[in-house]
Regions:
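Residue-level signature of outer-membrane beta-barrel architecture
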Residues: 88-90, 132, 180-184, 197, ...
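Short glycine/proline- and aromatic-enriched beta-strand/turn motifs that initiate or cap beta-hairpins
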Residues: 35-106, 185, 260
Length: 261
């Protein structure tokens, strides 16, 4: 049995700094709008758990590996995770920052089943958006998505020859969308849904984000959220041994604790 390790590391500090800088600009830009009525500015945090299903293809160099992981598979192979969101809002303008970090592993088959392989994926996704309220129930959203993915593949062929490769890439995508929220009846329940689309060839070819959740408010500062989250990334860059592909759908139920501060 022969092992041929190959390591490809690709980093891009500028997009990462750009995403953080853009988030800061969004936050600063919203402040003047509330200078006349500071009491109208509200802060909200959300910490949540996600049970994602992963379905797609991860490619490093000339090797593509299919990934198909259920929520139970994800939890079995989860090495670490953090999921949180901040939302600040005034009378019209606001800001939202959503961060998801996951470290997972998967097994799959590629090239029509001729090869078997293992894939390790570490992913950080951060979304920073400015919001503008059109009505009591509807807001427009525009901002940037920063995605950092590190992947490793161990591939075994028909002759039991093993080839290992690892690579990583990060990129920034513009995103636009809308958010809808409404109370349900006169009680403590409410519904929130959002749809965002981005990429447009700037980083990824296309990014789609859909979320929906029902909230139950326990008191005047906290509530529980139960919902569903869908993310679809279509990204490919480079060629030959420098090629990196991340064509992945991540979707599943989410439950979280929302609190005002």
């Amino acid at each position: 049995m022969t092992v041929m390790p190959t390591t490809l590391k690709r980093t891009c500090a500028t997009p990462g700094l750009a995403a953080l800088g853009l988030a800061a600009v969004f936050f600063a830009a919203t402040q003047p709008a509330f200078a006349q009525s500071e009491s109208s500015w509200s802060n909200q945090g959300l910490i949540y758990l996600l049970g994602p299903t992963l379905d797609g293809t991860s490619g490093i160099g000339p090797i593509d590996t299919d990934v198909d992981m259920s929520a139970s598979d994800v939890f079995e192979t989860l090495d670490g995770a953090f999921l949180g969101m901040y939302r600040g809002e005034g009378e019209r303008w606001g800001v939202m920052i959503d961060v998801v970090y996951m470290d997972l592993k998967a097994e799959g088959a590629g090239d029509g089943g001729a090869f078997s392989g293992k894939v390790e994926v570490e992913q950080t996704t951060a979304i920073a958006s400015a919001t503008y309220r059109l009505s009591p129930s509807t807001q427009l959203m525009a901002g940037a998505l920063y995605n950092d993915v590190s992947a490793g593949i161990s591939l075994k062929g028909p002759t039991d020859r093993i080839r290992e490769q690892s690579a990583g890439d990060d990129w920034v995508d513009p995103i636009v969308g809308a958010l809808f929220e409404t109370p349900i009846g006169a009680g403590n329940w409410s519904f929130t849904g959002s749809a965002q689309i981005g990429g447009f060839g700037v980083g990824a070819d296309l990014v789609t984000i859909l979320t929906g959740s029902f909230s139950y408010r326990f008191n005047n500062w906290s509530s529980i959220d139960i919902g569903y989250r869908y993310l679809d990334f279509d990204y490919e860059d480079g060629d030959g041994l420098e090629r990196f592909k991340f064509d992945m759908k991540e979707h599943g139920p989410a439950i979280g604790w929302r609190f005002d501060f």
